[in-house]
Amino acid sequence: MPSYTHFMKILILNGPNLNLLGTREPEQYGHASLADVEALCRATATPLGLEVHFVQSNHEGELIDHIHAYGQLCQQGKALGAVFNPGAFTHTSVALHDAVKGTGLPVIETHISNVFAREAFRHHSYLSPVAVGVIAGLGIQGYALAIQALAHRQPK
């Protein structure tokens, strides 16, 4: 399981194929790279007093490990939650749903493209029912908005 040691944290979690940002279907996802997304996230989080932990993985189990670790940090009051772009796992992963639900990790599901303006199979999300919010179709700016939302969120 990953270890995290600093205070106050926010996890930026990216799923499969997001390592290809900037070159994969730019008409759908734009020309920004994953490094650009990371820079935007850090630039947004730093003035809010947040430390970003940025992760991209093409492997479901690795994403689950980070969700588990951050769920524990949130319970300890050391993290606010996660901005999570699950990529194609959005539409297929009961395991990610169960990890978020089981840990209580506050997640804002984030998509660069408007998944509802795309193929019908992309219209269903297994994550949305356990997310505290969903942002879609606003490009990489959605990550910044999600960070701001977590920073200003009042826990239930």
Give residue ranges: language-model regions.
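A charged, well-structured terminal subsegment
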Residues: 136-156
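Short glycine-rich anion-binding loops that position phosphate/pyrophosphate groups of nucleotides
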Residues: 16-18, 87-90, 113-115
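Short, acidic/small-residue loops that bind anionic groups at enzyme active sites
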Residues: 101-118
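Short catalytic helix/loop segments, enriched in acidic residues and glycine
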Residues: 27-46
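Short beta->alpha junction loops
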Residues: 51-61
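Extreme N-terminal starter segment of soluble prokaryotic enzymes
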Residues: 6-11
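Short acidic/histidine-rich motifs immediately flanking catalytic phosphotransfer sites
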Residues: 70-82
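Short Gly/Thr/Asp-enriched flexible loops that form oxyanion-binding sites at enzyme active sites
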Residues: 91-105
